[in-house]
Amino acid sequence: MRRIAEKIEYSPTTIYLHFKDKADLLFHLCEETFAKLATNAEELLKDQSDPIQTLRMIGLAYVDFGLKHPNHYRVTFINRPLEHFDPAHHEKSMGRQAFNLLKRSVEQCVNQKKIREIDVDVASQALWAAVHGITSLLITHPNYPWVDADQTINLLVDSMCSGLKA
């Protein structure tokens, strides 16, 4: 907490007025990140015209968010200590809410027969794993000679959506 206080030019005492400890600070930072991801997905879900395109856009928005906010992404998805994960609070968390929006998008695709009958939970986790994987790789390996990040991202998301089609 002292290093954080130094970095933001506050006293450690000031930080403790808002957060009980480092785990609490990290939890709130992660919740804020999940809230932003959820807001992005909610906006995209408003367009009901093409559920596959909406699903695709949610995947692209996820990657875009991570690349534009790599430090938040690292703390939330890469460096976050697992011992702070509390299953009792998971169902109410912003992370669960953000994931449920992805699930809702997959359900819309299934219900409108845009993708084959599939376990929505499995498909949603597979889609999340794919976009998380490419986001994490691009953030943690910036010096790797990526051919063209945008083309790679689009190919991944398009492949995932095409692979689910009926």
Report each predicted region and the residues it spans.
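Hydrophobic/aromatic-rich alpha-helical bundle segments in the mid-to-C-terminal region
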Residues: 74, 85-89, 110-157
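An amphipathic alpha-helix adjacent to DNA-recognition modules
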Residues: 18-42, 56, 60, 99
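Hydrophobic alpha-helical connector segments
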Residues: 42-71, 124-127
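Short secondary-structure transition hinges
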Residues: 68-104, 143
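C-terminal alpha-helix
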Residues: 105, 159-163
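Helix-turn-helix
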Residues: 1-24, 28
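Short helix-capping/turn signature of helix-turn-helix
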Residues: 19, 78-82, 129
